[in-house]
């Protein structure tokens, strides 16, 4: 075996002894066999030190690994995984072969990963006093202590990335990329090349394994939610969120329901 080729993704992460939280995600979600065998996978991982910082401050309010729900574990793991083997440089290529034109890739995440129980207090309110206008959420709010299973976004989850060659193709400056992703340290033209996934910087790339690659990030990758959910939950756009809530309603999705049952049975 060539010297540059490591073991499987699982074995390589476990052997380095600084990705223990990622290893726990793999084991808890039943992916040990998948990540131990040959195949085509790409995984973005954060070191244990990054997880310790994550548990100090995060949007879920969890302070330890043990407090993560199964849904949150799936978001962290599947949202950082691609069902193909990619070195960083190749991630900017489109499916049709065009180079440096892709800004996003389909992740291994699924809508069912984000399904969770919502309490009556968490559900939207149809703010309207117009006569005859329906308040679709009221029937769920009337029963105190009742919760419903729901996903807030039915679109296919994707991973957004900023690759150097991709940015050059679109004539986007490094300083612009740093501003977009919120890198307070900036990115000067004289600095070495970089890559970002959402707002996370790739610190070590293209670790070659028997069944794909993994890339090391500076922070724990938490895929952002939909635009409507970000507006609802960021604390600074509550009034605008109430306007959107007026026109919102719960919809039954038979396919999603069956997928959820299959996942939990």
For the regions a language model picked out, list residue spans one by one.
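Mature, structured domains of secreted/extracytosolic soluble proteins
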Residues: 1-265
């Amino acid at each position: 075996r060539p010297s540059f080729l490591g073991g499987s993704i699982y074995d390589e992460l476990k052997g380095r002894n600084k990705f223990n939280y990622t290893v726990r995600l793999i084991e808890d979600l039943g992916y040990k066999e998948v990540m131990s065998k040959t195949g085509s996978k790409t995984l973005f991982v954060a070191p244990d030190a990054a997880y310790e910082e994550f548990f100090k401050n995060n949007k879920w309010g969890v302070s330890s690994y043990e407090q993560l729900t199964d849904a949150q574990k799936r978001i962290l793991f599947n949202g950082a995984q691609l069902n193909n083997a990619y070195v960083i440089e190749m991630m900017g290529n489109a499916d049709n072969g065009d180079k440096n034109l892709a800004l996003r890739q389909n992740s291994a995440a699924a809508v069912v990963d984000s399904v969770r129980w919502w309490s009556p207090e968490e559900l939207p309110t149809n703010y309207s006093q117009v006569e005859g206008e329906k308040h679709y959420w009221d029937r769920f709010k009337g029963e105190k202590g009742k919760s419903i299973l729901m996903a807030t976004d039915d679109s296919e989850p994707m991973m957004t990335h900023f690759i150097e060659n991709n940015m050059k193709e679109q004539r986007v400056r490094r300083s612009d990329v740093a501003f977009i992703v919120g890198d307070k340290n900036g990115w000067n033209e004289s600095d070495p090349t970089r890559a970002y996934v959402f707002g996370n910087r790739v610190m070590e790339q293209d670790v070659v394994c028997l069944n794909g690659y993994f890339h090391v990030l500076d922070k724990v990758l938490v895929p952002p939610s939909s635009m409507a959910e970000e507006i609802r939950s960021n604390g600074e756009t509550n009034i605008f969120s109430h306007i959107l809530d007026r026109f919102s309603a719960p919809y039954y999705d038979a396919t999603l329901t069956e997928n959820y049952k299959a996942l939990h049975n």
